[in-house]
């Protein structure tokens, strides 16, 4: 191997062709693979644990090794039958974009270092702003995912509303809000007593009346309500809070409204999603994850801020060793001054290139398809004996559970549904996950992969139905 860490031009081509062939083979034959191929951790440890090599190895053989022992020992979140958590149905154009971004080693942190890349990011952010109804004056940037996007937005909210003085400040959100919000608030220094969880209604949306009452009570106690976090598509069941009502309340109370649309926000492209997400454009800040419902490879999240300059006012620092990168030219931007990351990937490229290659109409159709699949599952369960739909299909998520007619014990029913989900994964024909809603263990299905067909979904549900009957046989009849 070369001491200057280079391969010859021919070696680079051959290695690149080999990598591309592996990826295309994976994508074209994904449906023939089990959804999850993970094996015992001891076996993996024995195969992959070693000392750092003193000398190099043949890169072609190393790619074969990785394909056998790493890429075939994972859960394929891009598999059309992966219906657990939030699937990651990426697209090949996004993969190529990531390859190009790494190959050219783009540094989209300062205009002086990556002007073309920064303009692509500005353009793509503008597309998302327009899509979500944010004003032209709004700003944003791409980050690693929803967790970093929520942290970025809440850091801006702390600066804008509290000038970083968090004493007696209170933030409000529902019991269905993603845990990344709790983590972000912990990082930002908020204590447990400064976090107020508001009850949800029968549709698992935040109770606006309870929120209004709590804010009023907190003000009388000398506390400082400063932020309400709305759900624009919960991870649990796809519920969307009453965004217009929350915007009205926050406007009246001079409170920052942050909308977590990490999962659900892209659904605004669809007619049904747009109806559910009415008012999302009124949020002071918004997060969304293109690596979820915009079908991008990991990782890429996004944060939008309604008022311009808030990002740079919150994060900008200018030590002497980067003053050469400073710019005051209109239209130029240094994204490294707009968030937590200074070193950052050219994440915008895959979103930009995917929109350019496929067009927004294709994304709209793909999102509509995911919403329809969940509705198809709900309809199937509605006709099936011994099945309960716990939350109806909304934004591509439906939750349900199996209740054998002869069983009445809640604990037993919970255990059966847990075992059923484990057995589905073990059989390899699909993968679903469980969650807890209304004090019940439920099965959760998320159907956003555009390459899952209606026929496949019906076959999966038929197999799950038969497997549920098989699993329940091992449980004794229990009367309440």
UniProtKB/Swiss-Prot annotation:
The broad substrate specificity of AADC-BA could be exploited to produce various aromatic biogenic amines. GO terms for biological process: amino acid metabolic process; carboxylic acid metabolic process. Its cofactor is pyridoxal 5'-phosphate. InterPro entries: Aromatic_deC, PyrdxlP-dep_de-COase, PyrdxlP-dep_Trfase, PyrdxlP-dep_Trfase_major, PyrdxlP-dep_Trfase_small. Belongs to the group II decarboxylase family. Involved in bacillamide C biosynthesis. Catalyzes the decarboxylation of L-tryptophan to tryptamine. The tryptamine obtained is then probably incorporated into the bacillamide C peptide, which is derived from the amino acids alanine, cysteine and tryptophan through nonribosomal peptide synthetase (NRPS) biosynthesis strategy. L-tryptophan is the best substrate, but the enzyme displays broad substrate specificity for various aromatic amino acids in vitro and it can also catalyze the decarboxylation of L-phenylalanine, 5-hydroxy-L-tryptophan (L-HTP) and L-DOPA, with lower efficiency. This is Aromatic-L-amino-acid decarboxylase. It comes from Bacillus atrophaeus.
């Amino acid at each position: 191997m070369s001491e200057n860490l280079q391969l010859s031009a021919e070696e680079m081509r051959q290695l690149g062709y080999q990598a591309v062939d592996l990826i295309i083979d994976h994508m074209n034959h994904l449906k023939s693979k089990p959804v999850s191929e993970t094996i015992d951790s001891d076996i993996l440890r024995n195969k992959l644990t070693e000392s750092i090599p003193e000398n190099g190895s043949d890169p072609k053989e190393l790619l074969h090794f990785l394909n056998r022992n790493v890429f075939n020992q994972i859960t394929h979140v891009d598999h059309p039958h992966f219906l657990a958590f939030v699937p990651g149905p990426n697209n090949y154009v996004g993969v190529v974009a990531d390859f190009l971004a790494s190959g050219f080693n783009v540094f989209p942190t300062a205009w002086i270092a990556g002007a073309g890349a920064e303009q692509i990011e500005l353009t793509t952010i503008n597309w998302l702003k327009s899509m979500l109804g944010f004003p032209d004056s709004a700003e944003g940037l791409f980050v690693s995912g929803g967790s970093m996007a929520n942290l970025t937005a809440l850091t801006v909210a702390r600066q804008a509303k509290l000038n970083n003085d968090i004493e007696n400040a209170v933030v409000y959100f529902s019991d269905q809000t993603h845990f990344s919000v709790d983590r972000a608030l912990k990082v930002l220094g908020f204590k447990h007593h400064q976090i107020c969880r508001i009850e949800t209604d029968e549709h698992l949306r935040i109770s606006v009346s309870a929120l209004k009452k709590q804010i009023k009570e907190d003000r009388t106690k000398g506390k400082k309500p400063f932020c309400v976090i709305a759900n624009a598509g919960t991870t649990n069941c796809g519920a969307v809070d009453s965004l217009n009502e929350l915007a009205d309340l926050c406007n009246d109370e001079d409170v920052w409204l942050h909308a977590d649309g990490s999962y659900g926000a892209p659904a605004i492209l669809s007619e049904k999603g747009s109806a559910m997400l009415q008012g999302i454009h009124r949020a002071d800040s918004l997060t969304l994850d293109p690596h979820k419902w915009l079908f991008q490879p990991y990782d890429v999240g996004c944060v939008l801020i309604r008022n311009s300059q808030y990002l740079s006012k919150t994060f900008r620092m200018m030590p002497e060793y980067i003053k050469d990168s400073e710019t005051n030219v209109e239209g130029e931007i240094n994204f490294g001054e707009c968030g937590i990351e200074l070193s950052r990937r050219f994440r915008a490229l895959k979103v930009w290139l995917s929109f350019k290659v496929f067009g927004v109409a294709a994304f709209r159709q793909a999102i509509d398809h995911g919403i329809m699949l969940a509705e198809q599952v709900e309809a199937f369960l509605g006709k099936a004996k011994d099945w309960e739909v716990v939350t109806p299909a909304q934004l591509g998520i439906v939750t349900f559970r199996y209740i054998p007619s002869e069983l009445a014990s809640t604990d037993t029913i919970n255990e059966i549904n847990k075992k059923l989900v484990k057995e589905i994964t073990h059989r390899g024909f699909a993968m679903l996950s469980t969650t807890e809603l209304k004090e019940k263990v439920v099965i959760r299905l998320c159907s956003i992969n555009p390459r899952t067909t209606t026929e496949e979904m019906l076959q999966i549900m038929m197999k799950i139905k038969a497997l549920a009957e098989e699993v329940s046989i091992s449980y004794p009849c229990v009367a309440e």
